[in-house]
């Protein structure tokens, strides 16, 4: 005796089989991933970052007696007046980069010398603690400063740890060239001297509206193919997105 199969059951079985087959051929797309290279230039003739508060900001703005943009040299027989915590203002006389905080730690003539001990004031805090630095950094498709420009990173980073080892970063990547032509917002803690830090993607505009995800931030040594007279910090930013 044969059991008559329901046409509805047969159709359901066929549709399920087709759906499984299509899913196997066309898996769900992976989250978009792309790279940015951020060039942060402190000091020199064409800086893209400038401290605006704290001791370092006072030096740049000429608010500390005898401080000059390209060096700190008191007049002959003159006595420098210390700032509020008793520390003397200090500036690299070669390119105007303060001996203090940046994305590469203490900067001397464009060299990354993260091994140098951070200068501390009488209160035990680094001289750059609390310094807010405004950035208009260049974003490129490759690690060289002459690579294809993708846009600008505009925002701030703040020396947020007492020992000068971290920077709180908040900036918008304004992507004006290449495949992407919209804005992404980033926020998080960058650890100076660490092999990798993570920033959160906190949204965006245009194509990246309601975007979320994270970015892996790795410090690199600048290639030096494009000579600059300031101190360059180079960051490789790998962005993982969902939107």
Swiss-Prot record:
GO terms for cellular component: apoplast. Pfam families: Dirigent. It comes from the Eukaryota. InterPro entries: Allene_oxi_cyc_Dirigent, Dirigent. The keyword RNA-binding does not apply. Keywords: Apoplast, Secreted, Signal. Residues 1-24 form the signal peptide. It is found in: Secreted, Extracellular space, Apoplast. The keyword Signal applies. One of its GO terms (biological process) is phenylpropanoid biosynthetic process. Homodimer. Dirigent proteins impart stereoselectivity on the phenoxy radical-coupling reaction, yielding optically active lignans from two molecules of coniferyl alcohol in the biosynthesis of lignans, flavonolignans, and alkaloids and thus plays a central role in plant secondary metabolism. Belongs to the plant dirigent protein family. This is Dirigent protein 16. The lineage of its organism: Eukaryota, Viridiplantae, Streptophyta, Embryophyta, Tracheophyta. The gene is DIR16.
């Amino acid at each position: 005796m044969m059991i008559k199969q329901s046409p509805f059951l047969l159709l359901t079985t066929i549709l399920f089989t087709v759906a499984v087959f299509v899913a196997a051929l066309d898996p769900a797309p992976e989250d978009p991933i792309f790279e940015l290279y951020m060039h942060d230039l402190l000091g020199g003739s064409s800086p893209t970052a400038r401290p605006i508060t704290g001791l370092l900001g006072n030096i740049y703005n000429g608010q500390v007696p005898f401080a000059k943009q390209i060096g700190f040299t008191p007049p002959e027989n003159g006595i420098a007046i210390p700032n509020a915590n008793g520390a003397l203002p200090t500036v690299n006389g070669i390119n105007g980069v303060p001996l203090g905080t940046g994305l590469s730690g203490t900067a001397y003539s464009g060299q990354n010398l993260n091994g140098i001990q951070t200068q501390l004031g009488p209160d035990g805090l680094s001289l750059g603690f609390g310094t807010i630095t405004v950035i208009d950094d260049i974003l490129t498709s490759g690690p060289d400063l002459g690579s294809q420009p993708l846009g600008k990173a505009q925002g701030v980073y703040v020396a947020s740890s007492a020992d000068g080892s971290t920077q709180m970063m908040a900036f918008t990547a304004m992507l004006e060239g290449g495949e992407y032509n919209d804005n992404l917002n980033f926020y998080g803690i960058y650890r100076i001297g660490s092999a990798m830090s993570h920033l959160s993607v906190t949204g965006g505009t245009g194509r990246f509206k309601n975007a979320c995800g994270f970015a892996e931030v790795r410090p690199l040594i600048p290639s030096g193919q494009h000579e600059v007279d300031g101190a360059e910090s180079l960051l490789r930013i790998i962005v993982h997105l969902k939107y």
